[in-house]
Curated annotation (Swiss-Prot):
<comment type="subunit">
    <text>Homodimer.</text>
</comment>
<comment type="function">
    <text>Glutaredoxin necessary for virion morphogenesis and virus replication. Functions as a thiol-disulfide transfer protein between membrane-associated OPG128 and substrates OPG095 or OPG053. The complete pathway for formation of disulfide bonds in intracellular virion membrane proteins sequentially involves oxidation of OPG072, OPG128 and OPG088. Exhibit thioltransferase and dehydroascorbate reductase activities in vitro.</text>
</comment>
<keyword id="KW-0676">Redox-active center</keyword>
<keyword id="KW-0249">Electron transport</keyword>
<dbReference type="GO" id="GO:0030430">
    <property type="term" value="C:host cell cytoplasm"/>
</dbReference>
<dbReference type="InterPro" id="IPR036249">
    <property type="entry name" value="Thioredoxin-like_sf"/>
</dbReference>
<protein>
    <recommendedName>
        <fullName>Glutaredoxin-2</fullName>
    </recommendedName>
</protein>
<dbReference type="Pfam" id="PF05768">
    <property type="entry name" value="Glrx-like"/>
</dbReference>
<feature type="disulfide bond" description="Redox-active">
    <location>
        <begin position="13"/>
        <end position="16"/>
    </location>
</feature>
<keyword id="KW-1035">Host cytoplasm</keyword>
<keyword id="KW-0813">Transport</keyword>
<keyword id="KW-1015">Disulfide bond</keyword>
<comment type="similarity">
    <text>Belongs to the glutaredoxin family.</text>
</comment>
<dbReference type="InterPro" id="IPR008554">
    <property type="entry name" value="Glutaredoxin-like"/>
</dbReference>
């Protein structure tokens, strides 16, 4: 069973689309799940299944810890049911305007280094 990369992006965001396209190159190693963050957090979105308290906590955590990320990536281990935050910002080159803005070697390293169960995310 492969680990899963969960990509939280925004609609109509070219950087998010380019990151998603670049990460697709890792699909032989990971299952990849793309999540539209706005639809996810809408009142009737998928996050509503968590209940109001957990949903509110999740929204608060996103706002407090991930608001400076254009796109967020988590890796998920379906066997242990643990998640880890992947610091994608280290792999991005914002001078590029296509999927090459993601340095896949750096991203792979960040995915491997991401520690399960650590929250809030440790960023350098």
């Amino acid at each position: 069973m492969k680990n899963v990369l969960i990509i939280f992006g925004k609609p109509y965001c070219s950087i998010c689309e380019n990151v998603s396209e670049a990460v697709e190159e890792l699909k032989s190693e990971y299952d990849i799940l793309h999540v539209d963050i706005l639809s996810f957090f809408l009142k009737d979105g998928d996050s509503s299944m968590l209940g109001d308290v957990k949903r509110g906590t999740l929204i608060g955590n996103f706002a407090a810890h991930l608001s400076n990320y254009i796109v967020s990536i988590f890796k998920y281990n379906p066997q242990t049911k643990q998640m880890a935050f992947v610091d994608i910002n280290k792999s991005l080159d914002f001078t590029k305007t296509d999927k090459s803005l993601v340095n896949l070697e750096i991203l792979k390293s960040e995915i491997e280094k991401a520690t399960y169960g650590v929250w809030p995310p440790v960023t350098e």
